[in-house]
Each structure stands twice: as structure tokens, then as C-alpha cells.
Swiss-Prot record:
Its EC number is 5.4.2.10. GO terms for molecular function: magnesium ion binding; phosphoglucosamine mutase activity; phosphomannomutase activity. This is Phosphoglucosamine mutase. InterPro entries: A-D-PHexomutase_a/b/a-I, A-D-PHexomutase_a/b/a-I/II/III, A-D-PHexomutase_a/b/a-II, A-D-PHexomutase_a/b/a-III, A-D-PHexomutase_C, A-D-PHexomutase_C_sf, Alpha-D-phosphohexomutase_SF, GlmM_bact. The keyword Metal-binding applies. Belongs to the phosphohexose mutase family. GO terms for biological process: carbohydrate metabolic process; peptidoglycan biosynthetic process; UDP-N-acetylglucosamine biosynthetic process. Binds 1 Mg(2+) ion per subunit. Its cofactor is Mg(2+). The modification Phosphoserine is found at residue 102.
Length: 450
């Protein structure tokens, strides 16, 4: 059954437009508080946020809702999403909340929820929350006046996260002699990432580390590598790291300024962990968007690749089911379950840097683990995502899939967070893949206005 408020990564929308309004955010706080409060627990919620302007508004609204439901709110301030997941466990909270729209522009915002185990909530839990959200607010059982919650700002939380990230490396691993440019996307990692790298011994040049509420993900971070590439060239850095607005994804560039996507980063970590006996069950989990070249590379090494729907929560679910400890997406969500319950851009980057130090290879050599199969991906903004269900569109999709056969892949899907349909064709013939994608985009555009 389609969900009303939750997408693939929480509740998301434009700030001050439903559902990202203060009144609805307060109701979310009440509903989640009612569902998770228990007399057997501390009735505690941790709330983090990124650096967009509307976070102040939504944070206060959520605090009002949670405290009205009888929960104490621990406010973390601007902090990466994986830090919220970690601190949810560390502070023994009943629920964790991250206010962020990830890689989106400042005018969007969202609410991500984590359970007491640090994992994102299940579909079943989100369905229960939606049922409460659809009820009248006067029907929700608020706390009595003696049990109203309190709000408290947590001191030093960012330094706890930095230590946690550093501890994912062996104590003898240092990053001395590495010149690293880190692009913080003017987002939640602007303090933690440069500091962690510096404490590990690297020479750090931080860019896009001055958030002002509006510039998060603005021509920077993992969605736009231009400024990172330019700075790497300018300072002759060994490597560049691009994080997104909430720090749960990472892309990198080598010393030549060439992009290293999530698939290549996963390949580096998986190969190293396999050689050192750390890879569980000889396999990894990715999504349907990961390149066929990665699958071929792993197969040659006797490793399995399991694909899921797009969304790191689905990757994590499959990892838990199969007991795998590496998973991720080509977009840069990389989940290393030995350390993390969700994607962590800083931790993933540290593992790659450790491989770089051990191999003594330049980044351009280390991260060329496989030759990507040509993959043409285009996005089409639509008014109605149900355009994919129209008979002529369905027929065209079937025909294109049959044409590709076993020599390629076709993926057409509606985004879970944006009014966009993504069309991807993958195969060894780039020209043919481009033609297939262009034809389908044209067809979708025509029927979107029918």
C-alpha cells in the first residue's frame, strides 16, 4: 500500500509548505512520541539537524510535539545524520530524529527517524505513525501536566562523533603526508570532517565549510564536484572528498580531479576487506542503479552482488537479512555495518584513505578497480508520476527491455523524494543506450501532459 507522508527517506517537502510546516512537524513529534514512549524506558529523543534555514523552525516544532507527548528532547544541533544514529544508541534514546533533506537545496527539508537500535524505522512502524498523523490532534493522548518532557542541548556531541569515526581505523593508521581537500557542502559535516582528518594527521584544505542557512548543497558537495576538482588541482592535493548536506554520502576525486563514484569506492573497500578476511559471506549489497561493471568485477573474485530497490534503507534491510557488512549505492551512500547502521560519508572515506595508505598507490590507480559499463541516466520532471502506468509507456518499456536482453539493463523509476522519473539504460553500446533513454524520455514527456 502506498504511504501518504513517508517517502524512501522519511518525510520531505518544501519548507513552510505542507508537510514541512511547523504545525505538522509538531504533530509528527506528538505521534512519534506517543508511539515510542514507554514507562519502561527513559522516554528520550535525540534531535539533530543540518544547516538549512528552516531547521530552526522545524526543530522547535518537533520539540513542542515530543515534550507534549511526555518525552525529553536532547538537541544535538548541526550534526551529520550518521551521528544521530550513533548517538541514539549511545544516549539510550527511544527514537532519533534528523531534520534534513540530504542533498537537496536549502528550500527543501525533511524528517528522518531512527529507532533505538540506530536503524531507520521499518515500513510497519512508519505506517503506524501515518495512522496517528491522520487522526485528529485532539485525539492523540498527550502527557499529563506532571509528565511533560524537557528539552536540553547536548554539549560535545560533535566530538563524540569525531572520536567514533576515528575509531573505525586501526590505531596505527595515520594520514600523515596526505594533502586532502574536503568539500563539506556547507552542511552538517562542516565541523566534524575537517577536524577528524586533521586529527588523523592529514594536511586538510576545507572548502564550502561556511554554512549560512541558504548555501547548503549550492554548487558544492557530492552533487557538484566542480569546486572540489578545481581546488584539488590548485593545491595539488592527493585526494578530494565530497560530502553531501547531511553527511550520509560521499564521492571522491583523485589527484587528477577525476570523479570516483560510490561503486568504485565500494569495490575498493570490498576487495580490501575480502583480502584481509573481514568481508562477511563473500558478498555485498547494492541497488539496481549500481554499474554492471561492479557486478562483473566482484564475480571475477568469487563475490556475490545482491541488488535492491533504490534507497539506503532497502540496502540496509538486505544486509541485515543476508548478514553482509558492506552495502551502498553508486550515489555515495556506503553502509559499513561493522561500524554504522546507516550511510556515513566520513567513515567510508576513512576506509578508502586507509587502503590508499596501505597500498601506497595514488588515488587514480587505487580506485580504478573496474571499467564501468556505459550507463545513460536522465531525469524527467513530471506532473504525474503515474504516467509510467499508461499503456503506451508500458509497451515501450517492455520493448526496450526485450531489445537489451541479457546484454544490458533498463531501469525506469519514479523518485521517492522528488517529482522526477529517472530513466537509465546500461550496456556496452553507449550510442544505443543514449537513443533508448532519449526515446523513453520523449514518450514520458508527451504522456505526462495528456
Amino acid at each position: 500500500m502506498a504511504r501518504k507522508y513517508f517517502g524512501t527517506d522519511g518525510i520531505r517537502g518544501k519548507a513552510n509548505i505542507f508537510p514541512m510546516t511547523p504545525d505538522f512537524a509538531m504533530k509528527v513529534g506528538i505521534a512519534v512520541g506517543v508511539l515510542f514512549r514507554s514507562k519502561a524506558t527513559s522516554r528520550r529523543v535525540v534531535i539533530g539537524k543540518d544547516t538549512r534555514l528552516s531547521c530552526y523552525m522545524l526543530e522547535n516544532a518537533l520539540v513542542a510535539g515530543f515534550t507534549a507527548a511526555g518525552m525529553d528532547a536532547f538537541l544535538l544541533g548541526p550534526i551529520p545524520t550518521p551521528a544521530v544514529a550513533m548517538l541514539c544508541r549511545s544516549l539510550r534514546a527511544d527514537i532519533g530524529v534528523m531534520i534534513s533533506a540530504s542533498h537537496n537545496a536549502f528550500y527543501d527539508n525533511g524528517i528522518k527517524l531512527f529507532g533505538p537500535d540506530g536503524f531507520k524505522l521499518s515500513d510497519e512502524k512508519e505506517t503506524k505513525i501515518e495512522a496517528l498523523l491522520d487522526s485528529d490532534i485532539s485525539e492523540l493522548p498527550l502527557a499529563n501536566c506532571e509528565e511533560i518532557g524537557r528539552a536540553k542541548r547536548v554539549e560535545g556531541d560533535i566530538y563524540r562523533y569525531i572520536e567514533y569515526a576515528k575509531r573505525t581505523l586501526p590505531r596505527d593508521v595515520r594520514l600523515d603526508a596526505l594533502r586532502i581537500v574536503v568539500d563539506c557542502a556547507n552542511g552538517a559535516t562542516y565541523k566534524a570532517a575537517p577536524r577528524a582528518l586533521w586529527e588523523l594527521g592529514a594536511e586538510v584544505i576545507a572548502i564550502n565549510d561556511e554554512p549560512n542557512g541558504f548555501n547548503i548543497n549550492q554548487e558544492c558537495g557530492s552533487t557538484d564536484l566542480t569546486s572540489l576538482r578545481n581546488k584539488v588541482h590548485e593545491v595539488r592535493a592527493d585526494v578530494g572528498i565530497a560530502l553531501d548536506g547531511d553527511g550520509d554520502r560521499v564521492l571522491m576525486v583523485d589527484e587528477k580531479g577525476q570523479m570516483i563514484d560510490g561503486d568504485q569506492l565500494i569495490a575498493v573497500i570490498a576487495e580490501h576487506w575480502h583480502k584481509t578476511g573481514r568481508l562477511h559471506h563473500k558478498g555485498i549489497v547494492t541497488t539496481v542503479m549500481s554499474n554492471l561493471g561492479l557486478e562483473r568485477f566482484l564475480s571475477e573474485k568469487g563475490l556475490k552482488l545482491i541488488r535492491t530497490d533504490v534507497g539506503d534503507r532497502y540496502v540496509v534491510d538486505m544486509m541485515r537479512q543476508k548478514k553482509y557488512n558492506i552495502g551502498g549505492e553508486s550515489s555515495g551512500h556506503i553502509i559499513l555495518s561493522d561500524f554504522c547502521t546507516t550511510g556515513d560519508g566520513l567513515v567510508a572515506a576513512l576506509q578508502v584513505l586507509a587502503c590508499m595508505k596501505e597500498s601506497q598507490q595514488p588515488m587514480s590507480q587505487l580506485c580504478k578497480r573496474f571499467e564501468p559499463v556505459p550507463q545513460i541516466l536522465k531525469n524527467k520532471v513530471v506532473h504525474n508520476k503515474n504516467v509510467l502506468q499508461k499503456s503506451e509507456v508500458q509497451a515501450a518499456l517492455t520493448k526496450a527491455s526485450e531489445h537489451l536482453g541479457k546484454e544490458g539493463r533498463l531501469l525506469v523509476r519514479a523518485s521517492g523524494t522528488e517529482p522526477v522519473i529517472r530513466v537509465m539504460a546500461e550496456g556496452d553500446d553507449r550510442k544505443a543506450m543514449t537513443a533508448i533513454v532519449d526515446d523513453l524520455i520523449t514518450l514520458i514527456a508527451r504522456h505526462d501532459h495528456d
